[in-house]
UniProtKB/Swiss-Prot annotation:
Biological processes per GO annotation: DNA-templated transcription initiation; response to heat
Coiled-coil regions listed in the entry: none
Function comment: Sigma factors are initiation factors that promote the attachment of RNA polymerase to specific initiation sites and are then released. This sigma factor is involved in regulation of expression of heat shock genes.
DNA-binding region, residue intervals: 254-273
Record text on subunit structure and interactions: Interacts with the RNA polymerase core enzyme.
Protein name: RNA polymerase sigma factor RpoH
NCBIfam families attached to this UniProt entry: PRK06596.1, rpoH_proteo, sigma70-ECF
InterPro entries referenced in this protein's UniProt entry, alphabetically: RNA_pol_sigma-70_dom, RNA_pol_sigma70, RNA_pol_sigma70_r1_2, RNA_pol_sigma70_r2, RNA_pol_sigma70_r4, RNA_pol_sigma_r2, RNA_pol_sigma_r3/r4-like, RNA_pol_sigma_RpoH_proteobac
One Pfam family here: Sigma70_r2
Region spans: Sigma-70 factor domain-2: 53-122
Length: 285
């Protein structure tokens, strides 16, 4: 991967709203334009052609990344990983196969995002309260199975989760509202610069959702392991992990941390990756 292509992959580290707006300004290619550019890259190694192919598909990566919003991971990071998958797809795309790039690239984009989620999900799971995890993901899983609830399904879900029908409707509305916010165009007043984490749907402190949740000793042990593992990191790595993963109210972007430490965003990403690797090893030990 060239330095220019790496720069493209790290594009969402700044303001997410501005990035999405910029991604949507790049015109989509016709089948003929796409084939011509792909041939230049495939047969001549034309990097300008590769750049155009990538830029014209950035909006598609944003679309794919939105499907992973429920994992509590920063949207900018999901998009960044998806962009890496897009670049791998562009590099491997054979224009003679007879399919559009978007059909070929979707598998690479999802593969990179899947790997990122699997690498980081356990840390997020430990760092979020048990009540938030159980409530959000149980309801989200049920919605994936049933879609938008009718009244009978609302009552069934309420029985399954041990809550009232009113609570189910309220949570469903919050989840739908957050999805609508992400769907808004860059020209709308609403800002989608904040990552869509489970805590955003669960900040109503009057909710009685947590009343019937069972104790989970493994999670308590994992939380203790995380605390112990954090103490083994250097001060800068601790700060990066806290700012990126543990501060639910004000998560920092890679660029913000890069400015704080006077290094590149790529360097912060490397430090974060190394720290996360150490934390995972400690939790899984």
């Amino acid at each position: 991967m060239t330095k220019e292509m790496q720069t493209l992959a790290l594009a969402p580290v700044g303001n997410l709203e501005s990035y999405i707006r910029a991604a949507n300004t790049w015109p989509m290619l016709t089948a003929e334009e796409e084939k011509e550019l792909a041939e230049k890259l495939h047969y001549q190694g034309d990097l300008e052609a590769a750049k155009t192919l990538i830029l014209s598909h950035l909006r598609f990566v944003v679309h794919v990344a939105r499907n992973y919003a429920g994992y509590g991971l920063p949207q900018a990071d999901l998009i960044q990983e998806g962009n890496i998958g897009l670049m791998k797809a562009v590099r491997r795309f054979n224009p003679e196969v007879g399919v559009r790039l978007v059909s070929f690239a979707v598998h690479w984009i999802k593969a990179e995002i899947h790997e990122y989620v699997l690498r980081n999900w356990r840390i997020v799971k430990v760092a979020t309260t048990k009540a938030q995890r159980k409530l959000f993901f149980n309801l989200r899983k049920t919605k994936q199975r049933l879609g938008w609830f009718n009244q009978d399904e609302v009552e069934m879900v309420a029985r399954e989760l041990g809550v009232s029908s009113k609570d189910v409707r309220e949570m469903e509305s919050r989840m739908a509202a957050q999805d609508m916010t992400f769907d808004m165009s860059a020209d709308d007043d609403a800002s989608d610069s904040q990552p869509m984490a489970p805590v955003l749907y669960l900040q109503d402190k009057t909710s009685n959702f947590a009343d019937g949740i069972e104790e989970d000793n493994w999670e308590d042990q994992a939380a203790n392991k995380l605390t112990f593992a954090m103490e083994g990191l250097d001060e800068r790595s601790q700060d990066i992990i806290r700012a990126r993963w543990l501060d639910e109210d004000n998560k920092s972007t890679l660029q913000e941390l890069a400015d704080r430490y006077g290094v590149s965003a790529e360097r912060v990403r490397q430090l974060e990756k190394n720290a996360m690797k150490k934390l995972r090893a400690a939790i899984e030990a």
